[in-house]
């Protein structure tokens, strides 16, 4: 058994053990409410974590940069602007009118529409200059974030507290209907990703090498940006913004696999994301008693590990 297979199997076993602990710790074996509710949250963790991991790894392959995530393109900022506008014009009753499912659908559709605008406006003009695409995405992110902050100033304190809750990663908002839809879409995309994974290996070599091997960037860049947009739309609408968690998750996966092949990196990245989310959720529920958020804990856990492996790599130079 190779060390790569061993690492993946260990991560899968860790996911299983953490899932069992998450479901049954302090549950009282309540099959009517507690355990079903935790199963829903566990499903959200698995789906959301997989979306975050896959989108981050694919985006870094396209950008040829391991310190960036899709959030730099402004996808999550659109979500925040929408939530702020909903509270500004409709108030707290807006969430009640739309409901969790309605908000999920509208948020996902808006993110996808924004991604299509990016593709037709930016990618068609600058598809041969990825740095220009990233720069425009960064500027759009700053503009949209500023718009969201401007709207926050105009809403009431009660509405602001609701907005703050929506701006953090949370698994409490998941519903069976949204999970079914998100899981179906993720499964379909996973099948396509499995067929395209050899292309990612070539893309990871660089644009010139990819073109010399027969890959046209005019074809694969829009395709993969569409996949990324769908994954980000699902994860953001389902569990909220994840900001730069994907940076830590993807880089930890690279360090564990030590392989340039994405058929190894993608599954490991998914298991790492699930482990991080499960660990953070367990700590939020049973250690911090909901006095902190999953986002903070995941950034601390992943950031700490990422710093350690960076220092180790530096010391080996």
Curated annotation (Swiss-Prot):
It comes from the Bacteria. It is found in: Cell inner membrane. One of its GO terms (molecular function) is transmembrane transporter activity. Keywords: Cell inner membrane, Cell membrane, Ion transport, Iron, Iron transport, Membrane, Plasmid, Transmembrane, Transmembrane helix, Transport. It is a multi-pass membrane protein. Disruption phenotype: Mutants cannot transport ferric-anguibactin and are unable to grow under iron-limiting conditions. Its main location: membrane. The chain crosses the membrane at residues 10-30, 39-59, 72-92, 98-118, 133-153, 177-197, 228-248, 268-288, 291-311. GO terms for cellular component: plasma membrane. One of its GO terms (biological process) is siderophore-dependent iron import into cell. Pfam families: FecCD (PF01032). SUPFAM superfamilies: ABC transporter involved in vitamin B12 uptake, BtuC. InterPro entries: ABC_BtuC-like (IPR037294), ABC_transptr_permease_BtuC (IPR000522). Part of an iron transport system composed of the outer membrane receptor FatA, the periplasmic binding protein FatB and the inner membrane proteins FatC and FatD. Involved in the uptake of iron in complex with the siderophore anguibactin. Responsible for the translocation of ferric-anguibactin across the cytoplasmic membrane. Belongs to the binding-protein-dependent transport system permease family. FecCD subfamily. This is Ferric-anguibactin transport system permease protein FatC.
